[in-house]
Amino acid sequence: DDTVLEKSGVRMEGISRVFDHMKGRCVLGYKLLLCAFFDGKTTIPFDFSLHQEKGKQGDCGLTKQQRRKAYHAKRNNGSPDYERFQECKKPKMEVAVDMLRRGWKMGLHAKYVITDIWFTCEQLMACVRSIGKGAMHFVGLAKLGKTKYTVSGRKKNAAELIAAYERERGKVCRKYRCRYIRLNGNLGDTPVRIFLIKYGRN
């Protein structure tokens, strides 16, 4: 998962304006990417990274004067602090993949990788299934977007799957007060089990 670390000092190294979904606007700070192990009772963070966002203009949302005054340091290539700073500029998805692979090598052999909507994509699913020869499974929320899933030999997005299978396979879950459709299919080359869930009347 990732979260916003809001800061007030523009001179901090790697600082940028990042989008805060809770506030609906950009704030000064970092994006914290956290990978944690959960056994049903205890959550143990085992890896993290800080990230900046370049923005549409590639200026991190800062003025020239602010960027010039920001802290800069020369580092030896390959040193831990050099690698950590380079990591700050990498895409979060790329770093998330590295975290999962490091965790497996450390002996954290989870059965499932759970993420939010932003990380649910074919790239991360394929990575998770490749670790430990398929020992881990991926669980994540997905948007009702344009992503195509192959079900019964045909490619359809979520809305099209609902229209095609709601009457035939729609079921009610009284415990969670929802209606759902369960389908087996593929996202690219990765086999997936799809749950299309509707809570309440809307």
At which residue positions do the language-model features occur?
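Short, basic/hydrophobic alpha-helical segments
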Residues: 87-111
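A short acidic (Asp/Glu
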Residues: 8-11, 121-128, 147-154
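An anionic, glycine-rich sequence signature occurring as long contiguous blocks
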Residues: 41-75, 85, 89, 135-202
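Short, surface-exposed basic-aromatic patches at helix termini and helix-loop junctions that form
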Residues: 105, 125-137
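Structured nucleic-acid-interacting core domains from mobile-element enzymes and related host factors
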Residues: 2-64
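Short, conserved catalytic/metal-binding motifs centered on acidic residues
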Residues: 1-8, 35, 113-120, 138
